[in-house]
Amino acid sequence: MRKLLNTLFVTSEDAYLSLDGENVVVNREKQVVAQYPLHILSGVISFSYAGASPALMGACAERNILLAFCTPRGKFLARTCGESQGNVLLRRTQYRSADDPLQSCRIARNFILGKVYNSRQSLERTLRDHKHRINEESMKAASESLKESLHMIAQETDMESLRGFEGSAAKIYFQVFDDMILNQKEAFFFHERSRRPPLNRINALLSFAYSLLENDCASSLEAVGLDSYVGFLHRDRPGRESLALDLMEEMRPCFADRFVLTIVNNRVIKEDDFEVRESGAVYLKDDARKVFLQQWQKKKQEVLTHPYLNEKISWGLVPYVQALLLARYLRGDLEEYPPFFWR
C-alpha cells in the first residue's frame, strides 16, 4: 500500500477493502494489515481482484472520495459514484480547457517538455554508460539539439509551433536510436518508425510497448475521473483516446523505449521470436509475447523516486500519479501540470 497525493494505492492483488467506522480497512487473508481514516483521503485506487465492501463503496460515494478498481496489471475496471457525480465538474473543466487554445497549449507544452527532456536523458544515459560502444559524436550532437529544443518549447504559446518542435525533436532522437541498440544489431535495427503495420523487429517491439503504455495511461485517467478521449495535444478523433496519448508522451522515451532497448540488449527477445506476414508486417510470436508481457510487469514493479513528489514509487504507478496531478491542476489545486522529468 502507498498513500500519495492523499490517494491510497492498494497494490496487493488479494487485498479486500472494508469499512470500520470512519476508516478504510485493508484485509489480506482475513487479517487487517492497514487502516486509514477516510477524512485524510481523496481517493482509493485498488489493483486487487478481491474487491471492496458495499459499506465502503457507499461511504466513499457519500463523501465524494474516488474509489476505483483496476486489475493487478493496471487495466481500469470501474469506479464508484454517488447520487451526484463529482467527476462531472472535473470533466466539464477538462472539456472547457480542451476547447480553449491557450489553456490547451499550456498543458500540451508541459507534456512535450517532459517527452523531449526524457528523450535527452535517455541519450545522456547511453553516453554515460556505453560511450565506447556508440558513435559518441552524433549522440552528443543529438543531445545538444534536444537541449536547445527545450528552451524554445518552454517559451512557445502556439499549438502548431509546439507540434512542430515536438516532431523535430522526435526526428533528432530517433536518428540516433540505432546507436542505443548495443547487441544483436544485425537482426534489430530501427532506421525509421513504421507503425501500421510495423515493418521490422524494433518497430514491432515499440508498437507493442506503446499499446501497453497507452492502455495503462487510459486506465489511470479513467480511474481519476478524466475523459481519456478528450486531449489537449492530440486532436479529437472518433475511437482515439487522445488524452491517453497526451499523457504517455512523456513516458515513451524513459519507460517504453528504454524497456525495448533493455530486452534487446540483454537478449531476452531474440531474432527468431518474430513472424513476418505476407504483407511485410512483423509481429512477435505468441511465446515471445508472453515473455514480453512478463518482463513488462517486472519493469512496472521496479522502484524509482518520483521527481515531483520526491517519493519512491513503482514505475507502474507513474501514469496514475501523473493523471492525479493533471486532475489536480484542472481543479485549480496546482498552478500548472508538473511533467514527469526522469532522473
Task: Enumerate the language-model features and the residues they cover.
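Phosphate- and other anionic-substrate recognition elements at nucleic-acid/protein interfaces
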Residues: 52-54, 58-111, 120
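Catalytic micro-motifs at enzyme active sites that drive phosphoryl/nucleotidyl and oxygen chemistry
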Residues: 14, 33-34, 49, 55-57
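Hydrophobic residues embedded in beta-strands of well-ordered beta-sheets
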Residues: 24-25
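Short alpha-helical basic/polar micro-motif
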Residues: 42, 54, 58, 211
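Extracellular/luminal Protease-associated
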Residues: 39-52
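Active-site helix-to-loop segments that bind/position phosphate- or nucleotide-bearing substrates
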Residues: 1-19, 29, 35, 87-229, ...
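Acidic/polar N-terminal loop/beta-strand segments that form early-domain functional surfaces
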Residues: 20, 29, 46-49, 70-72
